[in-house]
Every structure is written in structure tokens, then in C-alpha cells.
């Protein structure tokens, strides 16, 4: 809109400047009565001087509008080229349907090298990101995984084996004839050791995760269930639907599953845990549910490291994280992660 006002104003100034210059010259060198007669002569009932002013204004509006429209076209085209350059697209002077002014072409020619520089910077940034990802993924993660493997072996070879041996010894002692007070204490000690052993297995699960490697998320969860069924007294069942899951979120979902099961083994005091994975076309649903003692979500969710960790992993992949639990009613964790239609329909 400003272009229109500027163009019309410029035309009015130019025309009226010319008009008053002619008037001044006539006043000095010619008979002024010619101009005075314009006040009395009429065209269509309008004084000639007023009619001429109206015609001049109308002409200036028409010419100024045309010029302003062309200038506006040039500016819109330049703005479009700049936006394309910012987005990393290639700018080109051949894809326009308007006649460019020389000034516009000069401005465009300064934009071309900037566009090329932006493209180079984007490629460098992408390469740096890839290099950083490779370093973190290959080296840093390998170091962390190696350390976890070492700690897991040490815990399994020492603490877990010792607790198991102590549990067997206490079971044997309980079967012998003992005095009543000691006979009452042994079951308590046995229960404590069993709980400790279960917690150690949960920690081992957290420290030494079963890697997905070339397996799908569903296959990884099934292998995890098989491994758990051999080691824990709790019944572990699963209902896994096989479908393609983007690699970028598989690891996070698998770690969430491990964290949830670890928390269940350590805290739920339940006898059964169920793991479910379903494809809902636009999203996948991961659900882990137990029949344990439950808890008050408002009191625990901000204090539990495991729950915080699961929530953060879900947020990193754009998923929603919901937990439902009531005292003596068990706990249910649900993670909904968005899926592309191409991914959800793939075999």
C-alpha cells in the first residue's frame, strides 16, 4: 500500500510542479487573463481549472497505481527469492513471469552468492551433525555399554550368586528342628534375601540390556520376556503385534519397556506383568501392566527416577506417556508414539 501512495504522490508533485511553472511563466511573459478566464469557463458545468485538477489527479492515480503495482511485483519476487534462499532452495531468475527492472536484477545478483554460501553452510552443519552422531553413537555408547556389561558380570558373579547360596542355606536350616524364636526369624530372613535377589535381577536387567541389534522392537521384547521367565518368579506374558517401527524410536521404546519391567520387579510386589504392543495406524501403543500393590501417582511421579526417565524418553520421540495406578489396584503404563502411514502399513 505504501508503494501506491508514494507513486501517486510523486506523480501529483511532478504534474503540479509543471503546472505552476507554466502558470508562473505565463504570468510574467504572457497575458494572465488567459488563466483568469479558467475560473469562469466551464466544462460539463465544472470550472475549467477545477476540471483540469480533477483530470490531473485521476491521471496521477492511474499512472501511479500502475507503477506501484509493478514495483510491488518486483518486491514480492525478491522476497520470495530471499525466503527460498533461507530455506535452502536454489534461487533462479528464469522462474519468474514478470519483467524485472535493472535495479531488481542488481539486487538479485547480490542474493545469488549469499544463497550459495547458505547452501554450503547447511551442508557443513549436516556433516558436523553426522560426524557428531557417529562419534556419540559408535564410541561413547560403546564405552557406556562395555561398562554396563562389566558391572553386570561382576554383580552376577558375586552378589547374585552369594544371595542365591544364602537363600538355599536358609531354606535347608528352616527344614531342621529348631527352637521357635529362630524358626520364626528364618522365614523373614529368607524373604529378605529373596527380595534382594529379585531386586538385583531387576538391576541386572537395567544394567545389561538385551540389544535389539538387527531385531525388530517386537522381537526384542519377546526375547526379553523369554529371558525374564527363566529368572524371576513373577509371571510375564506378552501380546506383541509385529509391524515396522522407525529405527529412530525403537531403542527408546525398548528402554522404556526395560525400565518399566525393572520398576515392576523391584516395587510392585505383584505376581503378573503383561507387555502389549499394538499398531493403531497413526500411532503405536506400548502398554506395561501389573497386578501389584500400586501407588499414588501424584506422590510418586515426580520423585521416581525411573518414571522420570521413561517420561523423558517418550518426549524425545514425540510420544505421550501416561501412568495409571491406585493403591492395591496395580499399575498401567501407556506410551503412544506417532507413526507415518508408510511406516505403519509396511510389512
Curated annotation (Swiss-Prot):
GO terms for cellular component: plasma membrane. SMART domains: HATPase_c. It is found in: Cell membrane. It catalyses: ATP + protein L-histidine = ADP + protein N-phospho-L-histidine. The chain crosses the membrane at residues 13-33, 43-63. It is a multi-pass membrane protein. Residues 150-341 form the Histidine kinase domain. Its main location: membrane. Its EC number is 2.7.13.3. InterPro entries: HATPase_C_sf, LiaS/VraS, Sensor_HK_TwoCompSys, Sig_transdc_His_kin_sub3_dim/P. CDD domains: HATPase_UhpB-NarQ-NarX-like. Pfam families: HATPase_c (PF02518), HisKA_3 (PF07730). Keywords: ATP-binding, Cell membrane, Kinase, Membrane, Nucleotide-binding, Phosphoprotein, Transferase, Transmembrane, Transmembrane helix, Two-component regulatory system. GO terms for molecular function: ATP binding; phosphorelay sensor kinase activity; protein dimerization activity. Member of the two-component regulatory system VraS/VraR involved in the control of the cell wall peptidoglycan biosynthesis. Probably activates VraR by phosphorylation. This is Sensor protein VraS. It comes from Staphylococcus saprophyticus subsp. saprophyticus (strain ATCC 15305 / DSM 20229 / NCIMB 8711 / NCTC 7292 / S-41). The gene is vraS.
Amino acid at each position: 500500500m505504501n508503494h501506491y501512495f508514494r507513486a501517486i504522490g510523486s506523480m501529483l508533485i511532478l504534474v503540479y510542479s509543471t503546472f505552476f511553472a507554466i502558470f508562473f511563466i505565463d504570468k510574467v511573459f504572457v497575458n494572465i487573463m488567459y488563466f483568469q478566464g479558467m475560473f469562469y469557463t466551464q466544462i460539463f458545468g465544472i470550472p475549467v481549472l477545477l476540471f483540469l485538477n480533477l483530470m490531473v489527479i485521476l491521471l496521477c492515480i492511474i499512472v501511479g497505481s500502475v507503477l506501484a503495482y509493478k514495483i510491488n511485483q518486483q518486491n514480492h519476487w525478491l522476497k520470495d527469492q530471499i525466503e527460498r534462499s533461507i530455506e535452502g532452495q536454489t534461487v533462479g531468475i528464469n522462474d519468474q513471469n514478470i519483467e524485472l527492472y535493472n535495479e531488481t536484477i542488481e539486487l538479485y545478483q547480490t542474493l545469488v552468492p549469499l544463497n550459495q554460501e547458505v547452501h554450503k553452510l547447511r551442508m557443513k552443519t549436516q556433516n558436523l551433525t553426522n560426524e557428531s552422531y557417529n562419534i556419540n553413537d559408535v564410541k561413547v555408547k560403546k564405552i557406556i555399554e562395555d561398562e554396563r556389561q562389566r558391572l553386570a558380570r561382576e554383580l552376577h558373579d558375586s552378589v547374585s550368586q552369594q544371595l542365591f547360596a544364602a537363600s538355599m542355606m536358609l531354606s535347608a536350616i528352616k527344614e531342621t528342628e529348631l527352637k521357635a524364636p529362630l524358626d520364626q526369624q528364618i522365614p523373614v530372613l529368607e524373604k529378605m534375601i529373596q527380595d534382594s535377589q529379585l531386586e538385583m535381577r531387576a538391576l541386572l536387567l537395567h544394567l545389561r540390556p538385551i540389544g535389539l541389534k538387527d531385531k525388530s522392537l517386537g522381537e526384542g521384547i519377546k526375547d526379553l520376556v523369554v529371558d525374564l521367565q527363566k529368572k524371576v518368579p513373577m509371571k510375564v506374558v506378552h501380546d506383541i503385534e509385529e509391524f515396522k517401527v522407525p529405527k529412530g524410536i525403537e531403542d527408546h521404546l525398548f528402554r522404556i519397556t526395560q525400565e518399566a519391567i525393572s520398576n515392576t520387579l523391584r516395587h510392585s510386589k505383584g505376581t503378573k506383568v503383561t507387555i502389549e504392543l499394538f499398531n493403531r495406524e497413526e500411532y503405536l501403543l506400548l502398554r506395561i501392566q501389573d497386578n501389584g500393590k500400586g501407588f499414588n501417582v501424584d506422590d510418586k511421579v515426580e520423585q521416581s527416577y525411573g518414571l522420570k526417565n521413561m517420561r523423558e524418553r517418550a518426549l524425545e520421540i514425540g510420544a505421550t506417556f501416561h501412568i495409571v495406578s491406585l493403591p492395591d489396584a496395580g499399575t498401567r503404563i501407556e506410551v503412544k508414539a506417532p507413526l507415518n502411514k508408510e511406516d505403519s502399513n509396511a510389512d
